UniProtKB/Swiss-Prot annotation:
<comment type="function">
    <text>Displays ATPase and GTPase activities.</text>
</comment>
<keyword id="KW-0342">GTP-binding</keyword>
<keyword id="KW-0067">ATP-binding</keyword>
<dbReference type="GO" id="GO:0005524">
    <property type="term" value="F:ATP binding"/>
</dbReference>
<dbReference type="GO" id="GO:0005525">
    <property type="term" value="F:GTP binding"/>
</dbReference>
<dbReference type="InterPro" id="IPR027417">
    <property type="entry name" value="P-loop_NTPase"/>
</dbReference>
<keyword id="KW-0547">Nucleotide-binding</keyword>
<feature type="binding site">
    <location>
        <begin position="8"/>
        <end position="15"/>
    </location>
    <ligand>
        <name>ATP</name>
    </ligand>
</feature>
<dbReference type="InterPro" id="IPR005337">
    <property type="entry name" value="RapZ-like"/>
</dbReference>
<comment type="similarity">
    <text>Belongs to the RapZ-like family.</text>
</comment>
<feature type="binding site">
    <location>
        <begin position="60"/>
        <end position="63"/>
    </location>
    <ligand>
        <name>GTP</name>
    </ligand>
</feature>
<dbReference type="InterPro" id="IPR053930">
    <property type="entry name" value="RapZ-like_N"/>
</dbReference>
<protein>
    <recommendedName>
        <fullName>Nucleotide-binding protein PputW619_4266</fullName>
    </recommendedName>
</protein>
<dbReference type="Pfam" id="PF03668">
    <property type="entry name" value="RapZ-like_N"/>
</dbReference>
<dbReference type="Pfam" id="PF22740">
    <property type="entry name" value="PapZ_C"/>
</dbReference>
<dbReference type="InterPro" id="IPR053931">
    <property type="entry name" value="RapZ_C"/>
</dbReference>
Length: 284
């Protein structure tokens, strides 16, 4: 049986995540009391005819604070039933969460006459800290629309051909912020920038003219060699430590040229020696 626990601050996309999982064959339970997590795992093993082999639950700040603070021991108890259990934590920056609540006019579950929306969001962060700290996978939804979030969840959680650590190599642009879910970040802004070549500006790192230009730059090749040498040595150590997910982020200024080129090459190289390597370009 596989159990996915979905959590995150209100407005970060938990409902969308549950919808995606339900569409892909998961039996979904919204706002499960955290204290019932071990019982759910036990009943799922005993009554296999009643529950599907894939279950997803959301646990959020509507829980009792005492249950949320006990999440580490509750999770350990559930995993003690020998169930594959993944914790997905969704989040976005505070300005984005405020904007989403303003646009939808929904009420935050922790607001009241004495607590503003901004204060409720900060209180929620504290309450969900024990879950965030134990998340196997974190997805920053700040810059994602609904369709991108659905694709990201399917890519990271559902498209794993074999068990083991799932590696994601992701390009991004610093001007739109660093991905908060990255485990390793490499800054390639020091490399020659095709953006300043008028004939290359409208192309991306996926296009042959940009590929040819960057491949001819000695600094680019040296940077690629250094990064790939590091990753080939240390990523297997991540896998050996039973990490479920590892995200490697490659950043340039806009996320269109240098980071895309390096990310594509790294993905192709790592796929030759590691299982479950995926490539994503955040800002294309």
């Amino acid at each position: 049986m596989r159990l996915i626990i979905v959590s995150g601050r209100s407005g970060s996309g938990k409902s969308t995540a549950l919808d995606v999982l339900e569409d892909n064959g998961f039996y979904c339970i919204d706002n499960l009391p955290a204290g019932l997590l071990p019982q759910l795992a036990e009943n799922a093993l005993i009554h296999t005819e009643l529950l599907q082999p894939k279950v997803a639950v959301s646990i959020d700040a509507r829980n009792l604070p005492s249950h949320l603070s006990r999440f580490p021991e509750l999770l350990a108890e559930a995993r003690g039933r020998h169930i594959q259990c993944d914790v997905l934590f969704l989040d976005a920056d505070e300005d984005t969460l405020l904007k989403r609540f303003s646009e939808t006019r929904r009420r935050h579950p922790l607001t009241n006459a004495d607590r503003s929306l901004a204060e409720a969001i900060r209180v929620e962060s504290e309450l969900l800290g024990p879950i965030s700290d134990l998340a196997d996978l974190k997805i920053d939804t700040t810059s994602l629309n609904l369709y991108q979030l659905r694709d990201s969840i399917k890519l990271r959680l559902l498209n794993q051909p074999e068990p083991g650590t799932a590696f994601l190599v992701e390009s991004f642009g610093f001007k739109r912020g660093m991905p908060v879910d990255a485990d390793l970040v490499f800054d390639v802004r020091c490399l020659p920038n095709p953006y300043w070549k008028p004939e290359l500006r409208e192309h991306s790192g996926l296009d042959q003219p940009v590929i040819d230009y960057l491949a001819a730059q000695p600094d680019v090749e040296e940077m690629f060699t250094d990064i790939s040498t590091y990753l080939l040595k240390w990523l297997p150590r991540f896998a050996a430590s039973n990490r479920a997910y590892v995200t490697i982020a490659i950043g340039c200024t806009g996320g269109h040229h240098r980071s895309v080129y390096i990310t594509e090459r790294l993905g192709q190289l790592l796929q030759q020696s590691l299982k479950n390597v995926q490539v994503r370009h955040r800002d294309l």
